């Protein structure tokens, strides 16, 4: 029983005496490791961010081209006001001259043929 207690006390004293020495070294090592981690993150960020910005620019460019050429931008649907000189109604629709007299009916609208 006494040898167990003595062994425990010896191991305990060795652990306590070596503990503070490790604590003095660990903060410096931890600072170095965190600095290395930050350097790796900055390096990765410098590689990824320009590629993401380039990809975003390409997507925005494609989106703007698509919206310019979309049918809704080029054509006008049924019941929508149109210009008599430049009728851009959908296929199957025409832009006839207004038939009813009145203030509200003086503009041209796209109607079915």
From Swiss-Prot:
It comes from the Eukaryota. GO terms for cellular component: extracellular region. The keyword Secreted applies. Residues 22-74 form a propeptide. It is found in: Secreted. GO terms for molecular function: ion channel regulator activity; toxin activity. Disulfide bonds join 82-95, 89-110. Keywords: Disulfide bond, Ion channel impairing toxin, Knottin, Secreted, Signal, Toxin. Probable ion channel inhibitor. The presence of a 'disulfide through disulfide knot' structurally defines this protein as a knottin. Belongs to the neurotoxin 14 (magi-1) family. 01 (HNTX-16) subfamily. This is U11-theraphotoxin-Hhn1l. It comes from Cyriopagopus hainanus.
């Amino acid at each position: 029983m006494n040898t167990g207690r003595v062994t425990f006390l010896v191991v305990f004293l060795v652990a306590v005496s070596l503990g503070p020495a490790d604590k003095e070294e660990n903060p410096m090592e931890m600072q170095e490791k965190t600095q290395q981690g930050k350097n790796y993150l900055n390096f990765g960020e410098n590689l990824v961010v320009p590629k993401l910005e380039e990809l975003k620019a390409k997507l925005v460019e494609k989106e703007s081209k698509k919206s310019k050429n979309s049918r809704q931008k080029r054509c006008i649907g049924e019941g929508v006001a149109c210009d008599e000189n430049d009728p851009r109604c959908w296929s199957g629709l025409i832009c006839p001259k207004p038939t009813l007299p009145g203030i509200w009916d003086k503009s041209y609208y796209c109607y079915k043929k």
